[in-house]
């Protein structure tokens, strides 16, 4: 897939402004993310995904752009596509915060509980045994993990668990999560 129109934003307000004007007319946009070592400001990944969900858009493939940045494609969600568990957690929080737009809610309607149009269906969160064992193996990591917000715990564990079909990624993600949790730091995306 070729990289189309690009957009550089440094905060969620700028991204939300672009989405509010273009979410119904644009087919996609490639958001520019500067690498940390570039020293240039960029919107954090989690903020970008959350704002996209508010308008019924979703992130997809990433590609290198130049020596100091990469790009990620954002586009409207297909009508019958399903939300990942991570995005269900995000949407639940966005609904509670009153940030979801009508367009965003319409795009996820089929993933929502018919009994309550404002509450997405969510599977009960179960921490996989092997991940739990790793977290508990370090008392500092386990203490910090338990103090993180539940939504963050679910998103990060789903991110790790979702890479099981690629064991090298699973190990890399788990190690990175353990390292950051030991420092009591939350993160949005490994680069």
Language-model features, listed with the residues they occupy:
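Charge-dense, helix-prone N-terminal extensions
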Residues: 1-191
């Amino acid at each position: 897939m070729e990289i189309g129109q690009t957009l550089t934003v440094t905060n969620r307000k700028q991204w939300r402004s672009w989405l509010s004007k273009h979410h119904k007319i644009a087919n996609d946009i490639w958001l520019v993310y500067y690498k940390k070592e570039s020293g240039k400001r960029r919107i954090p990944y989690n903020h970008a995904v959350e704002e996209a969900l508010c308008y019924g858009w979703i992130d997809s493939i990433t590609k290198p752009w130049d020596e100091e940045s990469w790009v990620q494609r954002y586009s409207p969600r297909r009508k019958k596509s399903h939300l990942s568990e991570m995005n269900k957690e995000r949407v639940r929080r966005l609904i509670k915060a009153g940030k979801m737009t009508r367009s965003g809610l319409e795009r996820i309607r089929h993933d929502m509980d018919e009994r309550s149009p404002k509450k997405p269906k969510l599977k009960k969160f179960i921490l996989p045994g092997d991940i739990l064992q790793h977290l508990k193996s370090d008392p500092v990591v386990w203490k910090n993990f338990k103090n993180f917000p539940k939504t963050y715990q679910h998103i990060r564990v789903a991110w790790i668990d979702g890479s099981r079909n690629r064991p090298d990624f699973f190990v890399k993600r788990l190690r990175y999560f353990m390292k950051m949790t030991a420092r009591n730091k939350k993160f949005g995306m490994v680069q």
